[in-house]
Structures are given as C-alpha cells and as structure tokens.
Design a protein with these regions (language model features):
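Conserved glycine-centered beta->alpha loop in an early N-terminal alpha/beta scaffold
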Residues: 3-5, 28-251, 319-320, 324-325, ...
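DNA transaction DNA-binding modules
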Residues: 27-32, 58-77, 190-246, 337, ...
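P-loop NTPase catalytic core of nucleic-acid-dependent motor ATPases
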Residues: 214-303
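AAA+/P-loop NTPase substrate/partner-engagement loops
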Residues: 288-341
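A short beta-strand-to-loop transition that corresponds to the Sensor-1 phosphate-sensing loop
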Residues: 333, 372-382, 400-402
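Conserved catalytic/switch belt of AAA+ P-loop NTPases
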Residues: 344-359
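AAA+/SF3 P-loop NTPase mechanochemical coupling elements
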Residues: 360-377, 392
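Phosphate-sensing "switch" segment of ASCE/P-loop ATPases
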Residues: 369-371, 387-480
Length: 611
C-alpha cells in the first residue's frame, strides 16, 4: 500500500471517501488499477468483504454520460514519439500498455506495449484493404508490420503476429482485436489512406508500378527489397554515355539492352512471353550484359535484390516472376540448375506466364500468379539440347558468347553501379500514352513481316518484339540512329527444322543406325534389326530403348515418321512385322534414304514427339 494513502477502517468503507479517491483516478488506467488494488487489500485487512460491489455501484452512479457514451470516449493515444494521435474510446493507451476497465472493476489488457494503426492500404488490383501497424517494444524505436484486416480482426489469426515480436497470445488476442478495430472505426477519417500494390509493372488501372504517386508496397515482405531496388540514382547522362558507347559496337549486349525495354511492351501489344539466353565460357561479359539490362530499371549492385540466380525452387521462381510481372526477370548462373533436362518445364511455365493452381490452408484456392515479360538468362551452356521439345526451343533465343561483349567491362560496371534507373522510367512515361501503344503495335507488324520465313512463328514474334522495343528506345532515349535490325537478330533464331522435334528425333535414330550398322547384319550379336535397301528395320524393343535414351517419345516419333512418309507401317499399327535373322518380329521400319531439303513437314505443337 502507498505510504501516502490513508488506511481506511471497516466503517469508512461504507462511506464515499475511499470510492471518491478511486473515481478521481478513472482516466488514468495504470494509477486507477494501482489504487484499486491498494484499497481492495485495505478492505481485506479490516474485514470489509463488499469492496468490489461498492466500487462498481459508486462508479456507475457518478460517471458522466454524454450522447449515450461514457466520457472516456475522448481518450487519446499517449505514446512517446507516436507517429499519429488517435481516439481510443474507452481504452487507456500509454507507454505502460493498453488497458480498459471491465464491468468487474478489473482491467482488460489488450497489449503490454504501444501499438496502433497508422495507415490504410487499398490494393489497386483487387481492392483488398490492409493496415500498416506500428509498435514499439522498448525505446529503441518504432517498428512496423502490414497485415490484412482479416488477420488483425480475428482473435485466431492475429496471434500469427507474435512472430513479428508483437505481444499477442491466447490471453490477450480478443482484446487486441477489439482495440485495433475500435481505433480504425473511431479514426476512419484520421488514419491516412494510400494506394498499394504487391508487384511491379502494369496495374489494373493502367498505371505502372512503382512509378505512381502515393503508392505503397503491400506484397510479400521478402520482395520488398526488390521493389525498393527499382528507382533512379546518379546522373542519367553518365548512364546514357556509357550505354551509347556499347550501342556503337556490334556486341550482342545490345540485344540484352533491347530485351530489358521489350519486357514492358509485351502486354501492351498482346504478345507471348519469351526468353533470351546468353551462354559461353566465363570472362566474356555475359553477366555485365545482364547488369546493363538491370540498370535500365533499377539498382544493379550486388545485394540490391533485383539481379537473381537460378539457385532456387520452381515455386520460388514462379513467385518471383509474378512479382516482377512486366519488368524483365533476369537470372544468372544457369549451371546451378541440377536437372537441366527437366528444366524444360520451367521454360514452359515462365513463357506461359501463369503459375500453378494451389489450395489455400484456410480452404479454397490461393491467388495464382501471372506475368507478361521477357526473361533474360545466362550460363555456361545452352538451355536447350538435342531432345528438347519444340515448345521449349521455340520460346528461347539463345546467343553463344565466344568473344568479349565489352571493350571495357570494368568501366561499364563502374558507371552503371552509380547511375541507373532513369531510362526505364522515361521509357515507361512515353509508353503509357495511347499514341505510343498504337505506334508499338504498328512497328511490331512491320518488323514481323521483315524477318525471314526460315524461323518459326514464335521465334519471329520474339525477334519482332526486340526490334520494336529497340526502335522506340532509339527514338525516345538514345537518339543515336543505332537501332537493331532484323539482320542483327536473325542469326540467333532457331530455324523451323531445328525446332522440329520429329526431324531431330529421326536424325538421332539415323545417327544411331550409322554408328551401329554392324549390329543390323545377319547373325550379328547382339542384333538390333535388319536392312532392306533404304529401309532400316529396328526391333521394337531396341527402337523404344533408343528413343528413351535420347529423350524422345517412341510413339510420337513414329507418328512424325508416318506423316513425313518415312515409315512403312503395319495394317493397324505403326510397327510392322518383318524378318530378322529369319524370324518374324515387330519392327519400326524406317526409310533412311538421303535427306531431301524439302522433306520436312510442319506439325502442330500438340503432335510433336517430346516427353
């Protein structure tokens, strides 16, 4: 008991004196609770057993009522260095904690440390409202967390914020929910509101993130660093000067630069995603070319976050692609991919621009990430291989780097690490007008028609997008008359024959036969089949093993051979009964006459023989 507090007798507890003292402290939650405990202990010592009921009755009789609300409705947050002052209703909010008197003359404790909402974030794309919450566990400074209202206003979900060092548990979760909801309701016109976005690139209202005023990031916290890396720094003229010096050369780094600009026009002109892959030995400047592409939009420095490697999971890559959205996805060190054959599925995923549908822990489905962009990659080897599916080869422009891409790569790095982010913002400002979008669409058609007919439709499309973006960047940014031409890109486009998996599968089987011709002779051991004129008869089990070893589908390859007129098939089967060592056995009977330059036929993607 406080030494300055009078010791009341049992008789005095039947008077107003002790309760008047208590009423005087009603607006100071902590002092009120201290005095209540002292008086209650005093009552117990003198044998007075009705202190709680008497105190409750006195308070009820003497509290002032205004418009049906208790006078405590005028309480305000009283935190040291608070970012905003808010009405708290009947909550006492100070550095000692957040308390409220309950009907039993005790205290409901919402939180033992300062916490309050400071901003309302409305997502541009889906309208979801989140709150920025600030809290302080000590006097070292305020911290913040952004959470959905469905989390903050649920006594079960809010307990997840304990991982952020907010003091919340089963004990106080319900009271903390009430406190936060009361503050938002009482201060709806006081708490500032801002538009928010969870990704980079074009938004549903036609604007471009992050180049919008009063825009806040409300996405996954692990992407905040990348979001903040997209900004301008240093002098635009210095970046422009070094970049123009690269464009004066014939370096393929010019294509990497064009791809960086091209990424944001893919959605604008309604075309498909594609990949640009630089490969070759170390020391050629592949990574510097990628960093030059990064510097168009943001910070290319180590640790800035935008420039990533292949050292991650498929799910992580999917989420990253959905986050960068329309800006280029730039990945280094393809050699980190352990299973390069299965990487084709990643290529399809990146170029399709949509992630997998997944269930949510709370039921229903998670939001499926989508994106429309260009992926710029590098490594020591090409992504595609002999048995790659046509769909994968079709979507990638691969450039082998045998010679140095820069005359002085170190100088390029020094400049772009201190001067970056200006060109992308300027390019986007031009590109956001309707006139520019129409111009881009017209240029695309023009370039598409100018590219030779030897490459596939998807390869031609990707090349036309690169040429369109570079032409616009030349006009709007560089003004140097050094735009890329079709002749600059065509050498790197896959031909229709190279993309045709059936043709490559036939070539693989043909090469196998040539290198194992002795095993097709009579009485050879082992025996793989027989030969009759130009027709090579491969035993069914051997043919299927050859295809499996090369990564081809036996059935799909037989179908292609049939369509191309190279298969002698049975009456109701692609395999045919033939004599091998005097015995009838089912074989793949393939006409291996010398190739004709016009023999290959176009086959739809769905019929192509890849696994």
């Amino acid at each position: 008991m406080s030494t300055s507090l009078k010791e009341f007798t049992k008789e005095e507890f039947n008077t107003e004196a002790p309760y008047r003292l208590l009423f005087e402290k009603k607006d100071d939650g902590f002092a009120y609770l201290q005095l209540y405990n002292d008086l209650n202990a005093n009552a117990e010592r003198v044998g007075f057993k009705r202190f709680g009921a008497m105190a409750k009755a006195y308070m009820k009789q003497h509290e002032e009522h205004r418009s049906g609300l208790s006078s405590v409705v005028n309480n305000l947050t009283n935190f040291k260095d608070q970012p905003i002052e808010l009405l708290t209703g009947d909550w006492f909010a100070s550095d000692d904690g957040i308390l409220r008197r309950n009907d039993n003359q005790g205290m409901d404790v919402a939180c033992v440390h300062p916490i309050l909402p400071v901003q309302r974030l409305v997502n541009i794309d889906d309208g979801t409202v989140r709150l920025r919450i600030m809290f302080r566990r000590d006097f070292r400074g305020w911290r913040e967390v952004i959470a959905n209202k469905s989390t903050l206003f649920s006594s079960r979900e809010i307990k997840k914020l304990a991982d952020k060092d907010i003091s919340v548990s089963d004990k106080n979760a319900a009271f903390l929910v009430e406190y936060l909801q009361d503050l938002e309701d009482l201060n709806h016109n006081t708490i500032p509101e801002a538009q928010s976005v969870s990704h980079l690139g074009w938004t549903s209202n036609g604007m471009f993130s992050p180049y919008m005023e009063n825009l806040e990031f409300d996405g996954q916290e692990n992407f905040r660093k990348i979001f903040e890396s997209v900004h301008s720094c240093g002098e635009f003229e210095k970046w422009l000067e070094i970049t123009k010096s690269v464009r004066k050369t014939d370096s393929v780094a010019r294509i990497a630069l064009a791809a960086s600009f091209a990424s944001i026009i893919i959605k604008t002109i309604g075309k498909l995603n594609f990949m640009l892959h630089f490969w070759g030995g170390s020391g050629t400047g592949k990574t510097v070319a990628q960093l030059l592409a990064v510097s168009v939009w943001g910070d290319p420095n180590d640790g800035a976050g935008y420039f990533q490697t292949f050292n991650g999971t498929l799910v992580g890559l999917e989420q990253l692609a959905g986050f960068v959205n329309n800006l280029p996805l730039i990945l280094d060190e393809f050699q980190l991919v352990k299973d390069k054959k299965s990487f084709e599925q990643t290529v399809y995923m990146l170029c399709e621009g949509i992630g997998k549908t997944r269930g949510a822990k709370t039921g229903g489905l998670q939001k499926t990430p989508t994106w429309k962009n260009c992926t710029i990659t590098s490594g020591e080897s090409p992504i595609t291989h002999a048995s790659s599916g046509a769909g994968a080869i079709n979507r990638i422009i691969e450039i082998e780097c045998r010679e140095a891409l820069f005359e002085d790569a170190i100088e390029v790095l020094e400049v772009i690490r201190s001067n970056y982010g200006h060109a992308g913002k300027l390019f986007m400002a031009f590109m956001s007008t309707e006139q520019a979008k129409e111009k881009a669409a017209a240029l695309y058609k023009q370039f598409y028609r100018s590219i030779g007919a030897s490459s596939t439709e998807k390869q031609t499309m990707a090349a036309a997008i690169l040429l369109t973006a570079d032409a616009l960047a030349t006009e709007w940014i560089f003004c140097d008359g050094r735009a890329l031409t079709a002749e600059d890109i065509e050498p790197y486009l896959h031909t229709k024959e190279a993309v045709d998996v059936g043709a490559r599968g036939y070539e693989y089987v043909h090469d196998f036969y040539v290198s194992n011709a002795a095993k097709f002779e009579t009485n050879s051991d082992p025996c793989f089949g027989s030969v009759s004129g130009d027709e090579v008869r491969i035993i069914k089990s051997v043919f299927e093993r050859i295809c499996d070893d090369g990564g081809y589908s036996p059935r799909a390859l037989l179908s292609w051979l049939d369509q191309s007129g190279r298969l002698s098939k049975g009456r109701d089967n692609l395999y045919k009964s033939a004599k091998v060592n005097g015995k009838a056995v089912r074989c793949a009977c393939i006409n291996m006459a010398e190739n004709s330059p016009n023999e290959f036929v176009s086959v739809e993607d769905g019929e192509l023989p890849f696994n």
